[in-house]
């Protein structure tokens, strides 16, 4: 293995997920200023996620054709330029917010870079743990949920894009200096070889399982700030804290899931996860839907003044 590369992959993944998810914690404040309705706000939040899903194919292809490190550097530069333009030029319309979301999709595609970069250094029996450690970088969503709404309240949500550039530039330099491609990487395949994977029935099943698990995680994480604001009347900062707690739990369990998959197999681990997740979501659906049912002091402390 190569611990510095594993660390670089985690850091790159962590900060990439922070900015990929950035529009979620800022959604309430952006929607208020741009006068967006609920549907527009939802699409704005979903755009980086959808773009990231598609761009993972491109980034995965670049990993094979160039190298994971080169692909990671290119993706980071694109995101940094997009955030710099959003900070300096500003986001003044719904369409501009969607355009920013498209470019932030490159941050979401970091998944296709960080995992191969880290796992290719390790033998098969340890790849689950390596990918779990690198994959724990989705904790970057916790950073966005914790700090983005507060920074927006202090300096304006447009300036949050500028604040995000500081850790991103530090990560870019660290990644360039520390990360190394594995000496025995798989050779690049022809385009037809990629298409053959689509003929494998198991591939479709695993893509479906992944869309439910990780798609559910990032989808809920992006929607929770708006949900807490709409359903419970929480202000954006408090909604960010609540969301961060939910996201942190998922990020904390990811390395444990990788280690468990190494011991008992991926299928059994997925079955356990689906069972537990289904029970938790069912219990969550039984909770009070209105903050009015909470004790008075809690309701007054976290209330968010609504526009009439």
PLM regions and their residue ranges:
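Residue-level signature of mid-helix packing/kink "hotspots" within the transmembrane helices
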Residues: 21, 49-57, 109, 142-143, ...
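Extracytoplasmic gate region of multi-pass secondary transporters
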Residues: 23-27, 202-251
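Helix-to-loop junctions at the C-terminal end of transmembrane segments
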Residues: 55-67, 253-265
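Cytoplasmic membrane-interface "Motif A"-like loop-to-helix N-cap segments
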Residues: 65-76, 262-274
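C-terminal ends and interior cores of transmembrane alpha-helices
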Residues: 77-91, 276-288
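Cytoplasmic helix-loop-helix junction between adjacent transmembrane helices
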Residues: 100-137
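Helix-loop-helix hairpin linking two adjacent transmembrane segments in secondary transporters
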Residues: 133-177
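C-terminal transmembrane helical hairpin of 12-TM major facilitator-type secondary transporters
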Residues: 266-308
């Amino acid at each position: 293995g190569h611990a510095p590369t594993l660390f670089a992959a985690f850091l790159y993944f962590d900060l990439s997920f922070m900015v990929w998810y950035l529009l979620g914690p800022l959604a309430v404040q952006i929607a208020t200023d741009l006068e967006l309705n609920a549907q527009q706000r939802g699409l704005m939040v979903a755009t980086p996620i959808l773009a990231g899903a598609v761009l993972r194919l491109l980034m995965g292809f670049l990993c094979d054709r160039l190298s994971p490190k080169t692909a990671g550097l290119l993706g980071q530069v694109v995101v940094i330029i997009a955030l710099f333009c959003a900070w300096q030029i500003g986001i003044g319309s719904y369409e501009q917010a969607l355009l920013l979301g498209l470019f932030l999709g490159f941050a979401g595609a970091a998944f296709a870079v960080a995992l191969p970069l880290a796992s290719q250094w390790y033998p098969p029996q340890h790849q689950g743990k390596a990918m779990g450690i690198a994959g724990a970088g989705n904790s970057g969503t916790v950073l966005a949920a914790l700090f983005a709404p507060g920074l927006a309240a202090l300096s304006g949500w447009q300036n949050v894009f500028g604040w995000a550039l500081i850790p991103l530039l530090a990560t870019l330099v660290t990644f360039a200096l520390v990360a190394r491609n594995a000496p025995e990487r798989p050779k690049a395949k022809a385009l037809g070889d990629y298409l053959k994977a689509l003929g494998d029935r198991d591939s479709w099943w695993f893509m479906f399982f992944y869309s439910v698990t990780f798609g559910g995680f990032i989808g809920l994480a992006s929607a929770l700030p708006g949900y807490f604001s709409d359903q419970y009347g929480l202000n954006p900062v408090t909604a960010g804290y609540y969301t961060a707690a939910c996201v942190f739990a998922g990020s904390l369990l990811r390395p444990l899931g990788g280690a468990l998959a190494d011991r008992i197999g991926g299928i059994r681990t997925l079955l356990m996860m689906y069972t537990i997740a289904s029970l938790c979501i069912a219990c969550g659906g039984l909770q009070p839907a209105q903050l009015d049912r909470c004790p008075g002091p809690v309701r007054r402390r976290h209330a968010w003044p609504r526009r009439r």
